[in-house]
Amino acid sequence: MMKYDVVVIGGGPAGLAAALAARETGVKKILIIERDRELGGILNQCIHAGFGLHEFKEELTGPEYAQRFIMQTAQTDIQVMLNTMVLDISPERLITAAGTDGLKTIQAGAGLLAMGC
């Protein structure tokens, strides 16, 4: 069984930002679980500008904004599972997930739901 201090379910902008914030506060073992084949969530479809003014002090398209968070995440030791669907979360924070390589059981110290829309 895999064990993580924090497991973030959802690899869109909220999930990426939450994982990065947890890392900045000193959390060591962080996992992001994303059902899609890439991170970024709905932002990858938002081709209009207007993102990033608060966080990055410049106007970005949705994909550009997502890519900033993806790059920041890649520069850390945050683990990512793509193509993985969460099937169950128990009261004891045991997460059952199905990926391309079968079922996984993950023990989370804390879980954060950031599945978006």
Predicted region positions:
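FAD-binding core/adjacent interface of flavoenzyme oxidoreductases
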Residues: 1-9, 66-117
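Beta1-alpha1 glycine-rich phosphate/pyrophosphate-binding loop at the start
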Residues: 4-68
